[in-house]
């Protein structure tokens, strides 16, 4: 159960699709349900006239241009369902039903038993995603929980009061796509960073860190990736801005860059830096929680406190000024991330599902 239509690349959606692809390859029947009406805590009448107008426009767009996932390979055996909302009548019966975000949990909680054993794929936690109390309340519902990092696992276990119904299964990386195509030691001093408008991504902090680093190392360049049609004003004028790149383009950018920069305040796992590691980038990031699953300070990455662009810039400059350190971190990160595979994650998920569905 996803919270909305897949109009743009979203990390949590990619995780769901990766599992769906691999589960159908193992003989399971999988349907991925996308509601047109966004599953959120904000009712339509409580929003502004402009927001209501945008939603009406989105409905018309969905009628004229049916949704299609163009940014992620989907196995033909996966049933991609696009429905009006997450009412139980819109959802097929099954052995297991997975909520993938806290708003979807609130819908799935009321489903009858014929929809399947209830699971919750916990992918994020931060106050920017919704009311903290409601979010944490979903962790206490009688679902079987799957967290994507030890950081999230600890928070869910603390909220639930024990680990009985919680398992940690880290995300995988598709190494057939995200892999080295260029020597890590022969790369230009180019940085790559995402500029996403969500406040918890703290894009302004990342942009400021780039500006500070540029003053200390004028020869550096940067590729900033985003969704907006126009280059955001906070993106430095000297940086290139690339909108809605494909995976092939992203892999090429990673392989032509030396350093990946992450500025988030909180992340459940942080797929982009993990995928950048797989492509040979040294990672400089905020210590945003779930990134610790693969980012070990001074070993596979340089981490700084969230909300401190000056500290982020200092770590960028450390790598720009010390190529041996950059190459050491890039090599260690690349080696570390090889153990994160979707096959391993799917093995663990399949075992957990069979155990819980059989128990039910």
Per-region residue spans from a language model:
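Membrane-proximal helix-turn-helix segments that form the acceptor-binding/catalytic region
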Residues: 84-93, 126-148, 152-155, 159
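Acidic anion/phosphate-binding donor-loop and adjacent secondary structure
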Residues: 127-134, 157-158, 165-187, 252
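Short acidic/histidine- and often glycine-rich active-site loop of Leloir-type glycosyltransferases
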Residues: 233, 288-298, 302-303
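Conserved acidic donor-binding segment of nucleotide-sugar-dependent glycosyltransferases
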Residues: 244, 297-298, 302-309, 318-323
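Aromatic "clamp/platform" in nucleotide-sugar-dependent glycosyltransferases that forms part
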Residues: 265
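Short hydrophobic beta-strand element within catalytic cores of glycosyltransferases
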Residues: 282-285
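A short, well-ordered alpha-helix in the C-terminal region of glycosyltransferases
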Residues: 311, 318, 325-339, 348-351, ...
């Amino acid at each position: 159960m996803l919270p909305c239509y897949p109009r743009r690349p979203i990390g949590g959606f990619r995780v769901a699709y990766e599992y769906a692809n691999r589960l159908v390859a193992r003989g399971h029947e999988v349907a991925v349900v996308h509601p047109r009406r966004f599953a959120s805590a904000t009712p339509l009448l409580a929003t502004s006239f402009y927001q209501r107008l945008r939603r009406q426009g989105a409905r018309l767009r969905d009628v004229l241009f049916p949704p299609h996932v163009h940014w992620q390979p989907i196995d033909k055996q996966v049933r991609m369902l696009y429905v009006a909302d997450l009412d139980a009548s819109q959802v097929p019966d099954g052995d297991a039903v997975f909520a993938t975000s806290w708003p979807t949990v609130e819908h799935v909680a009321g489903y009858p038993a014929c929809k399947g054993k209830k699971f919750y794929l916990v992918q994020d936690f931060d106050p920017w995603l919704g009311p903290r109390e409601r979010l944490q309340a979903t962790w206490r519902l009688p679902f079987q929980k799957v967290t994507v990092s030890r950081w999230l696992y600890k928070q869910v276990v603390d909220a639930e009061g024990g680990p009985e119904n919680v398992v940690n299964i880290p995300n995988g990386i598709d190494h057939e796509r995200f892999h080295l195509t260029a020597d890590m030691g022969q790369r230009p001093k180019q940085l790559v960073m995402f500029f996403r408008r969500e406040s918890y991504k703290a894009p302004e902090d990342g942009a400021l860190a780039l500006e500070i680093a540029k003053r200390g190392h004028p020869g550096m360049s940067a590729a900033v990736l985003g969704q907006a049609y126009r280059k955001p004003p906070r993106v430095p004028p000297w940086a290139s801005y690339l909108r809605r790149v494909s995976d092939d383009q992203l892999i090429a950018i990673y392989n032509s860059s030396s350093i990946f920069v992450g500025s988030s305040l909180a992340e459940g796992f942080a797929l982009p830096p993990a995928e950048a590691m797989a492509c040979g980038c040294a990672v400089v990031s905020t210590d945003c929680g779930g990134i610790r699953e693969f980012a070990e300070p001074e070993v596979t990455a340089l981490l700084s406190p969230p909300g401190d662009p000056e500290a982020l810039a200092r770590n960028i400059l450390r790598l720009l000024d010390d190529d041996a350190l950059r190459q050491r971190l890039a090599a260690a990160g690349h080696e570390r991330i090889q153990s994160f595979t979707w096959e391993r994650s799917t093995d663990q998920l399949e075992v957990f599902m069979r155990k819980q569905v059989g128990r039910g």
